């Protein structure tokens, strides 16, 4: 009953994905996209953090899922959510910027470069939003250190981890920024570019619940595919960011080292990718569905 009443009151928001997006970019001063992105990220991190921790151990050490789970069990329940503050701060801010800047930049580019195709302006907006997110690299950096059990005896919380990096200079906070730029920039272009077409290929939603399911499927499928494609980049990033001090090695050099360590086998490089696929499916399903749902009620 509530679904049908809502449908009668707000018909433009429950038709096609093109119609869904158009009213959301009403003005640069509109902050609801930032707020909805923030809340969607908070919801996602709180639910999926333990799975992310298992995945991280696999990426860093190339171990099997069972061994990663045993490591977490050995660490104890009190350490299960250890390190959640950096990803919570980083993810909420990152997704607020991702969705908010994308909408604002899309509008600005379309307004000032009206001769360019909409696909081009939206792609540039997605790329710029993704690269801007990289300013939050220090949070991802500290998250990596807190999740690595080798550093458990060096610091016990986020503040101590940030403090441990301070003596190495500001550049140490941004170690691993290059793979993050690649991942975020091109990932955003594909995510925002394919989100509309995928949603349009799904059955037309006529109720809030059906709309929520479509948004979950759309975000989940995109997140799973993009997460799988970017998995090797995240493996390299985890290795780079697990180091404190020392020389700053290039992305190709670190990749070569990992490739040799894992017997030059592609399957070993993707160890943990199946878990990442399912985690991304759930995470981005939650993010996209929460974001779109909040847009309708804010």
Curated annotation (Swiss-Prot):
Listed GO CC annotations: mitochondrial inner membrane; mitochondrion
Pfam family, one: Mito_carr
Example GO biological process: NADP biosynthetic process
Location of the region described as Disordered in the Swiss-Prot/TrEMBL record: 1-21
TM region(s), chain numbering: 36-56, 85-105, 119-139, 180-200, 216-236, 269-290
Keyword Metal-binding: no
Segments annotated as Solcar repeats: 28-108, 117-201, 214-297
Localization per Swiss-Prot or TrEMBL: Mitochondrion inner membrane
Keyword vocabulary terms for this entry: Membrane, Mitochondrion, Mitochondrion inner membrane, Repeat, Transmembrane, Transmembrane helix, Transport
Reactions that this protein is recorded to catalyse: NAD(+)(in) = NAD(+)(out)
MF-aspect GO terms: NAD transmembrane transporter activity; organic anion transmembrane transporter activity
Gene3D superfamilies: Mitochondrial carrier domain
InterPro entries: Mito_NAD+_Carrier (IPR052465), Mitochondrial_sb/sol_carrier (IPR018108), Mt_carrier_dom_sf (IPR023395)
Biased composition (Basic and acidic residues): 1-11
Domain of life: Eukaryota
UniProt topology in membrane: Multi-pass membrane protein
Family listed: Belongs to the mitochondrial carrier (TC 2.A.29) family.
Function: Mitochondrial membrane carrier protein that mediates the import of NAD(+) into mitochondria. Mitochondrial NAD(+) is required for glycolysis and mitochondrial respiration. Compared to SLC25A52, SLC25A51-mediated transport is essential for the import of NAD(+) in mitochondria. The transport mechanism, uniport or antiport, its electrogenicity and substrate selectivity, remain to be elucidated.
Protein name, per record: Mitochondrial nicotinamide adenine dinucleotide transporter SLC25A51
């Amino acid at each position: 009953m509530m679904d049908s009443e809502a449908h009668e009151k707000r018909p433009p928001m429950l038709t096609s994905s093109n119609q869904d997006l158009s009213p959301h970019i009403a003005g640069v001063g509109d902050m609801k996209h930032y707020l909805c992105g923030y809340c969607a990220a908070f919801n996602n991190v709180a639910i999926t953090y333990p799975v992310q921790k298992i995945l991280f151990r696999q990426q860093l050490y190339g171990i099997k899922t069972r061994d990663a789970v045993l490591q977490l069990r050995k660490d104890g329940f009190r350490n299960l959510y250890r390190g959640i503050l950096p990803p919570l701060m980083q993810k909420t801010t990152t997704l607020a910027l991702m969705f908010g800047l994308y909408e604002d930049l899309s509008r600005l580019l379309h307004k000032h470069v009206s001769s360019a195709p909409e696909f081009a302006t939206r792609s540039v907006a997605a790329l710029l939003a993704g690269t801007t997110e990289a300013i939050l690299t220090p949070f991802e950096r500290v998250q990596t250190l807190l999740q690595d059990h080798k550093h458990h005896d060096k610091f016990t919380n986020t503040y101590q981890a940030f403090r441990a990096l301070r003596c190495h200079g500001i550049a140490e906070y941004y170690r691993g920024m290059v793979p993050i730029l690649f991942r975020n920039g091109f990932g955003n272009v594909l995510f925002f570019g394919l989100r509309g077409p995928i949603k349009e290929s799904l059955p037309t939603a006529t109720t809030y619940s059906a709309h929520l399911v479509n948004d979950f499927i759309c975000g989940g499928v995109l997140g799973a595919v993009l997460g799988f494609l970017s998995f090797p980049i995240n493996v390299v990033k985890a290795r780079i960011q697990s180091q404190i001090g020392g020389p700053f090695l290039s992305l190709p050099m670190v990749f070569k080292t990992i490739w040799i360590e894992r017997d030059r086998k592609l399957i070993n490089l993707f160890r943990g990718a199946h878990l990442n696929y399912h985690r991304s499916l759930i995470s981005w399903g939650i993010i996209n569905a929460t974001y779109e749902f909040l847009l309708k009620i804010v």
